Amino acid sequence: MSNNKGQLLQDPFLNTLRREHVPVSIYLVNGIKLQGQIESFDQYVVLLRNTVTQMVYKHAISTIVPGRAVSFATGESEESPAS
């Protein structure tokens, strides 16, 4: 997957979580679970706010789980399934 394709998915998802102040659980590759709200992000890091703001490097993140369902647009047109 090219970096551009990754950004097409990451940016709208993270931006929706940030804009709507959705509580998230972030699981790191070492198994640690962090909780809070996404304050900001860029190509390499996510700022996660709880009682303090933590800078979490994206390469250390395994999974981001929103506290509620969110919908976001990727800007790509989805192909309809063949009948």
Curated annotation (Swiss-Prot):
PROSITE patterns: SM (PS52002)
Keyword RNA-binding: yes
UniProt GO BP: regulation of DNA-templated transcription; regulation of RNA stability; regulation of translation, ncRNA-mediated
UniProt entry tagged with the keyword RNA-binding: yes
PANTHER family attached to this UniProt entry: RNA-BINDING PROTEIN HFQ (PTHR34772:SF1)
Family label: Belongs to the Hfq family.
The protein's name in its UniProt record: RNA-binding protein Hfq
Native source organism of the sequence: Polaromonas sp. (strain JS666 / ATCC BAA-500)
Gene that produces this protein: hfq
